[in-house]
Amino acid sequence: MFGSSVLPARVFNALLALCLLLSACRKEPLSETASAPAEAGIFIPDGAGDGCVWVVDSEQKGRLYLCGTIHILREGDYPLAPGYEAAYMFSEKLVLELPPGEGSSPELAKKMSQLGMFSADTSLEANVGAEAWTAVQAWATRRGLEASSINRFRPWFVSILMTAKEYAVLGATPDLGVDKHFSDRAQADGKPGEGLETTDFQLQMFAALTNRQQQELLDQTLAELSTVAGEYEKMIQAWKQGDLSALHAMLFREAEKHPDLMNLFLTARNLVWIDKLDAMLHRGEKAMVLVGAAHLTGDAGLIELLKKRGHRVRHYREVQDF
């Protein structure tokens, strides 16, 4: 689903707190100059998959371990591919979408619900089509929720709430997400950490959505509800194998019908992040960067953007000097 893979991690997780941010084929091909012979790798197959971990090197001796994450996972989705552990061990700091620990307090959920709530004189029913409202009511009944309570919230909030609830039913939780796993570990180990953006920035993205954009987000969520379980499993398998092509095709099959939402939640954020990552590389820093896997895929993804900046990008299994 679009929501689970592209929407900001902290916002998505906050909604799970109230009830909650991308198939084993081949890896996306690397450019000829960026590739190393497969036999040069120091990692051997271990049953955990190839993993979404890329090593980015600059001429200034900077190195980023660019790790694609899934923000919500199940216990059975572990262990992670060995590249994640190696990236943590060999990095000097952690870089996440948000600084470690930011937005984990109850105040975030409260602020989010306030932003997502209509004023007393209107409702969800009054702001979406009859078909959408009927579908929301049916979903609420199926999940044991009161439609009257949901009627108080804006379409964007309801969209994420529905997505979060569906993943919770599958046993997927942000407490098991890759981001949370390494964020908690870094804090316990005293490893420095920083974020690419802030919670307030993420929340304001939703506050800025037009009524049309909100309805598009809700309509897309409703259309995908019946396929959540199957699509989630496919997404996990593609992620485990580091198959960016499969991930991109899967995550954006429907999302690309809404280019303005894609730009807001993915493309525009990547363009801001790439400047920060580029600066780290030029300063010679060595960091583990954890972002939603969706941010790595496609021509507008971080991998291609880093290559265009002149950096060498290789899958970790093709790197000997890890």
Where are these regions (language model features)?
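Bacterial N-terminal signal peptides that target proteins for export
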Residues: F2-A14
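C-terminal motif of bacterial Sec signal peptides marking the signal peptidase cleavage site
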Residues: L22-A24
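Structured, acidic catalytic/metal-binding patches in enzyme active sites
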Residues: P29-P45, C52-F265
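A cross-kingdom marker for long, charged
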Residues: D260-F322
